[in-house]
């Protein structure tokens, strides 16, 4: 090989230096023209495209190509029906909440990417919190003629959130759960492009059961402040009242909801534990959104199974009281421990990291600043580990009672908590005998052989268990420390200092 020293810039070098610039100009021109022709907020989109190109031309070009390959969904409706939806949305934005009314659904003609010709469909606004400004994209629900389930169209406003929604549903499917499909589409309404949307198709058209949230939405629309996200107004409801299995499905969820049956008797506790833990991994919330959660019902077994759906940004988790079943609580704790390990994220990357990356390009998240989206999942894992190993899992207080002492234990955990030992003065560690628990408090313990296990905190009302400790159990004296951990889960052991109302023993010189 011969290397020649160049006295100037050759023509080939000039061409190679010019090529990236030309590609960039071509990309920006195509990007800009596409949005000028099809996008509502084309100015903002074009500016975002320029910024994305400046950060990484290759990534921006890949994302643009991915978007050009997305299917198109077309909706055509009469002007009067459009105005009816527009008026309903304006009212919802003023109230901050929308309560669907049957008469506000309109008819439309819809063309799906995989269908030939148009199909008739109902179109409506979804119930719940009204999102966005007056000129922002609309969230819509549509139901093709003959279908039972409504499909949802959500504008992609937050690409990172959309990416997590897609990843959440895909992870559920890969772990054995039925889940909705989430497909990015380009939405055209009456010939005008509305931009990038997610089309959510429910997991099944068969009978489902969930909670009717209309009373909660109405209360929120009237200005009521609901710390529980409105769950106090929840009422079991079925998707198809004319289904022969509907009464049994409704009764099954209602029995668990009212506490007449243990939750683990109507659904698989271990599966529900995994479902809840995967929800926290992808959303950061401790449980699925109660208003959107649906369950399938098997008439042969009488069992319910949770169905995955895209979780909203303003998620209202099922309250902890709904999971007031030790079998379910421990299953959730075990799954939180398992899915919060760093190796689990590596497993996800290996199984479908390429698919997630492709969705990131299509949704636009790969072209936005903000770093690695996997970092959000890592943060969620830290929160999951903290949930099963908090700094203050219980309160412990000791006070004299004649010749003996009373130890009061109050669990602050949503999971059963095992008290594994008592350290006395850093010298002696001994187990707490369940027989020391006062007889009137033994109902607050779980039956566990040779173990002292406190029941989970009952909602926001902690319950206290009293133990009568003999004086010799605290010898030789000194500071007292309790050891505890979540029961029947591979969770780390925590330490809790015991508060003393009076010194136990006088210090000897």
Residue ranges and their predicted role:
Residues 2-120, 346-509:
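Regulatory N- and C-terminal appendages and interdomain linkers associated
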Residues 133-166, 247-261, 269:
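Short, conserved helix/loop micro-motifs enriched in His/Cys and acidic residues
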Residues 86-88, 197, 208-212, 288-294, ...:
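Short, solvent-exposed loop/turn and secondary-structure capping segments
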Residues 121, 139-141, 153-156, 186, ...:
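Structural recognition of the beta-strand scaffold that forms the well-ordered cores
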Residues 124, 130-133, 146-150, 314-323, ...:
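Anionic ligand-binding catalytic core segments
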Residues 159-192:
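A conserved helix-loop-beta module that forms one wall/lid of the active-site cleft
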Residues 247-289, 293-295, 302-416:
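Middle-to-C-terminal accessory/interaction subdomains
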Residues 177-180, 193-274, 356:
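Internal "kinase-insert"/substrate-recognition segments embedded within catalytic cores
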């Amino acid at each position: 090989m011969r290397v020649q020293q160049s006295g100037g810039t050759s023509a080939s070098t000039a061409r190679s230096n010019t090529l990236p610039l030309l590609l960039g100009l071509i990309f920006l021109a195509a990007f800009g023209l596409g949005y000028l022709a099809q996008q509502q907020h084309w100015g903002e989109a074009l500016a975002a495209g320029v910024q994305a190109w400046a950060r990484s031309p290759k990534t921006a070009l890949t994302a643009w190509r991915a978007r050009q390959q997305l299917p198109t969904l077309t909706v055509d409706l009469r002007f009067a029906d459009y105005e009816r939806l527009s008026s309903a949305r304006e009212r919802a934005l003023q109230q901050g909440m929308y309560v669907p009314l049957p008469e506000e659904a309109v008819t439309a003609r819809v063309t799906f990417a995989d269908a030939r010709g148009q199909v008739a469909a109902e179109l409506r606004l979804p119930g719940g919190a009204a999102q966005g400004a007056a000129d922002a994209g609309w969230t819509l629900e549509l139901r093709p003629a003959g279908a039972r389930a409504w499909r949802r169209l959500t504008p992609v406003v937050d690409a990172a959130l959309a990416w997590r929604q897609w990843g959440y549903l895909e992870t559920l499917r890969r772990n054995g759960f039925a889940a909705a499909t989430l497909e990015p589409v380009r939405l055209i309404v009456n010939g005008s492009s509305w931009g990038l949307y997610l089309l959510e198709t429910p997991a099944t058209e068969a009978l489902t059961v969930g909670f009717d949230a209309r009373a909660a939405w109405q209360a929120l629309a009237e200005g009521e402040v609901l710390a529980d996200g409105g769950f106090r107004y929840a009422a079991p409801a079925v998707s198809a009242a004319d289904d022969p299995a509907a009464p049994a499905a409704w009764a099954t969820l209602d029995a668990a909801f009212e506490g007449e049956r243990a939750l683990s008797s109507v659904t698989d506790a271990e599966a529900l534990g995994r479902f809840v833990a995967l929800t926290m991994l992808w959303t950061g919330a401790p449980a699925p959104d109660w208003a959107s959660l649906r369950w399938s019902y098997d008439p042969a077994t009488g069992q319910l199974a949770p169905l995955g759906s895209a979780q909203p940004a303003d998620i209202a988790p099922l309250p902890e009281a709904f999971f007031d079943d030790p079998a379910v609580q421990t299953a959730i704790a075990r799954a939180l421990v398992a899915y919060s390990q760093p190796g689990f994220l590596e497993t996800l990357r290996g199984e479908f990291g390429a698919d997630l990356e492709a969705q990131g390009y299509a949704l636009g998240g790969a072209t936005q600043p903000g770093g690695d989206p996997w970092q959000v999942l890592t943060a969620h894992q830290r929160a999951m580990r903290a949930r099963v190993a908090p700094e203050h899992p219980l309160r412990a207080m000791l006070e004299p009672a004649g010749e003996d002492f009373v130890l009061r234990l109050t669990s602050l955990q949503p999971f059963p908590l095992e008290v594994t030992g008592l350290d006395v003065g850093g010298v002696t560690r001994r187990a707490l005998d369940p027989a020391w628990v006062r007889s009137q408090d033994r109902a607050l313990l779980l039956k566990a052989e040779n173990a002292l296990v406190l029941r989970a905190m009952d909602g926001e009302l902690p319950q206290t268990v009293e133990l009568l400790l003999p004086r010799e159990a605290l010898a030789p004296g000194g500071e007292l420390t309790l050891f505890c951990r979540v029961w029947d889960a591979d969770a780390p052991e925590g330490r809790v200092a015991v508060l003393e109302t009076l010194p136990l023993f006088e210090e000897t010189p």
